[in-house]
């Protein structure tokens, strides 16, 4: 998580225990992003992705909007946590 966000190991363990293991597509995307050099810093961390999933699940959200998707790792993580028949929107600049 961000350096300014205080989170202890107990919270990290709790988040990981209430979220999914990495999906094979997430693993493939992380591997792809590793090859992008310094620009890979735009990707969120695995912990941040799990935190997004955790927030979606505990609040039973039915929709998710993401502005700035990079290669799609974070929105994919959100999609995996959302229930069926939900609304998922990703917006990014067309380069």
Segments from the language model and where they lie:
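A short alpha-helical cap/connector motif
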Residues: 1-95
């Amino acid at each position: 998580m961000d350096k300014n966000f205080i989170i202890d190991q107990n919270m990290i363990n709790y988040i990981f225990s209430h979220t999914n293991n990495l999906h094979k597509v997430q693993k493939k995307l992380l591997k792809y992003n590793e090859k992008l050099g310094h620009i890979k810093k735009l990707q969120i961390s695995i912990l941040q992705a799990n935190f997004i999933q955790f927030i979606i699940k505990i609040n039973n959200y039915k929709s998710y909007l993401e502005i700035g998707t990079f290669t799609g790792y974070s929105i994919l993580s959100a999609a995996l946590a959302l229930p069926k028949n939900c609304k998922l929107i990703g917006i990014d600049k067309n380069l």
